[in-house]
Regions:
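Single conserved hydrophobic/aromatic residue that forms the stacking wall/gate
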Residues: 1-7, 11
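A short catalytic or substrate-binding loop motif that flags glycine-/basic-rich loops and adjacent residues
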Residues: 19, 29-34, 45-48, 59-63, ...
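C-terminal helical cap and adjacent loop that interface with cofactors, partners, or active-site loops
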Residues: 37, 62-64, 69, 86-201
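Flexible, glycine/threonine-enriched loop-and-boundary segments that flank and lead into catalytic domains
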Residues: 17-28, 51-54
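Histidine- and/or cysteine-centered catalytic micro-motif in compact active-site loops
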Residues: 43-45, 55-59, 70-74, 96, ...
Length: 208
């Protein structure tokens, strides 16, 4: 069922930060989620068996937008004697606040033997590039003036999105809400970590 592949919570007090239910214009018994994480799958030939994990919330450890692609391990590794020391191969796409791309790989050390070490190939926009780059809404406003709808959401896309979200919301209304809560300034509740650990995976926190 859908609700077994998602976690929804409310942040609580930490230090001087108010918990959500003590914020202005928020009901004391509010069950409005401030955090959600989930596991998504796509049932087609291209993405069959590939899990997509998503996570978003208020008052988390950092305000970032990031995509991490973890490549599958090969059945037979050339460095089989030291494969337990190999790091995961990752493609990290940083969207906000700092745009950039990095590729995390394992490379053979420049010594005798087959020992490896992690290496990182990175690209990040320079300060000058950032100064000369228009903001996202500038492009959209300019497109609007030109009558170009390429970068705007189409109604059919929006309709499909709500169809997907409504299906999850309907499942949650069928079971009694459970709000284990999480501390503000963290990456969410334990239940979010368990969602991945059941598959032998984990969130890639603090990676760039």
């Amino acid at each position: 069922p859908l609700y077994s592949s998602a976690a929804s919570d409310v942040y609580k007090r930490q230090k001087e930060v108010k918990p959500y239910r003590e914020e202005d214009r928020v009901a004391e018994d509010s069950n409005t989620p401030t955090f959600v994480s989930g596991k998504l799958t796509i049932d087609n030939f291209r993405w069959a068996g590939v899990p997509f994990y998503i996570r978003t919330g208020k008052r988390m450890k950092s305000k970032t937008i990031q995509v991490v692609v973890e490549f599958k391990e090969v059945p037979m590794n050339l460095y089989y004697e030291t494969d337990k020391l190999l790091d995961s191969n990752l493609l990290v796409i940083n969207i906000q606040p700092n745009e950039g791309v990095s590729l995390h790989l394992n490379a053979k050390k420049n010594i005798q033997g087959i020992d490896t070490e992690p290496v990182q190939l990175s690209y990040a926009m320079s300060a000058q590039d950032k100064m000369n780059t228009v903001d996202a809404y500038e492009n959209l406003l300019f497109d609007c003036l030109k009558g170009d709808a390429t970068n705007f959401t189409h109604w059919e896309e929006l309709k499909s999105t709500w169809k997907f979200v409504d299906a999850i919301q309907d499942e949650w209304t069928m079971v009694e809400p459970c709000f284990p809560n999480y501390e503000s300034g963290t990456n969410g509740p334990l239940e979010s970590d368990l969602l991945l650990s059941r598959d032998g995976n984990h969130w890639w926190d603090d990676i760039h």
